[in-house]
């Protein structure tokens, strides 16, 4: 869609990857757990350790497309993909890259479903699945866990214009913050979220009006 397949910029060091995944393969992690319990390594192979590392997602993309620029793996739970996009934006804004492959991917596993259910974070509308999730409804009751991936191609504006690329939108600011409040719950006053928005507006030189 970006028209960059076969372009030398992919392999000349001016293209990087910034991609998120909250964890590696949980099947591989469970194989190591079995090793500790059973005192055997029969489930392990030369790729087991690599599979369980979250950075493998970004690395595999770089290997597949033979990019030689920055490689930025992000592993920040539910924000892994969005932070990957933010870091890609910064890499281009600061002049380190002209193009970045950015986004996130996650596979689903029964252990993940179990954890969110234990936290009472999942929706209980099993009889009416079409009504959930509904994050902006006052009667919302939780998440619906799924798997998937999303990828954006970020490109320096003048570079994109010069090659006649179809530009969907322009990213002009990015902001991030940390609540430093709780492992799973946001700060009740919304300070962290507000700070992230303020940082993004300041980065974009925009007023909140």
Which stretches of residues belong to each language-model region?
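Active-site-proximal alpha-helical scaffold in enzymes
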Residues: 1-5, 54-65, 70-105, 144-165
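Conserved beta-ketoacyl condensing-enzyme motif
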Residues: 1-76, 105-113, 208-209
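Structural signal for hydrophobic packing residues in well-ordered secondary-structure cores
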Residues: 2-6, 37, 65, 92, ...
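Short glycine-aspartate micro-motif
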Residues: 14-18, 98-102, 133, 168, ...
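A glycine- and small-aliphatic-rich helix-loop capping segment at beta-alpha/alpha-beta transitions
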Residues: 27-41, 91-94, 115-126, 188-191
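Phosphate/pyrophosphate-binding betaalpha-module
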Residues: 103-139
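Condensing-enzyme catalytic core mediating Claisen C-C bond formation in acyl metabolism
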Residues: 129-208
């Amino acid at each position: 869609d970006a028209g960059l397949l076969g372009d030398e910029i992919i392999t000349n060091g001016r293209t990087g990857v910034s991609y998120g995944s909250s964890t590696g393969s949980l099947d591989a992690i469970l194989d190591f757990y079995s090793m500790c319990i059973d005192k055997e390594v029969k489930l392990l192979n030369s790729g087991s350790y690599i599979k369980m590392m979250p950075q493998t997602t970004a690395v595999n993309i770089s290997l597949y497309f033979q990019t030689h620029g920055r490689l930025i793996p992000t592993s920040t739970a539910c924000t892994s993909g969005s932070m990957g996009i933010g870091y890609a934006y910064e890499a281009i804004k600061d002049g380190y890259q002209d193009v970045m492959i950015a986004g996130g991917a996650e596979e689903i596993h029964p252990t993940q479903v179990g954890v969110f259910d234990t936290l009472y974070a999942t929706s209980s509308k099993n009889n009416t699945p079409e009504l959930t999730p509904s994050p902006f409804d006052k009667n919302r009751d939780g998440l619906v866990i799924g798997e998937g991936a999303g990828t954006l191609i970020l490109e320096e504006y003048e570079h994109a214009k010069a090659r006649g690329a179809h530009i969907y939108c322009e990213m002009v600011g990015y902001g991030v913050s940390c609540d430093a409040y709780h492992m799973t719950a946001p700060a009740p006053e919304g300070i962290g979220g507000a700070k992230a928005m303020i940082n993004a507006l300041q980065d974009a030189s925009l007023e909140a009006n």
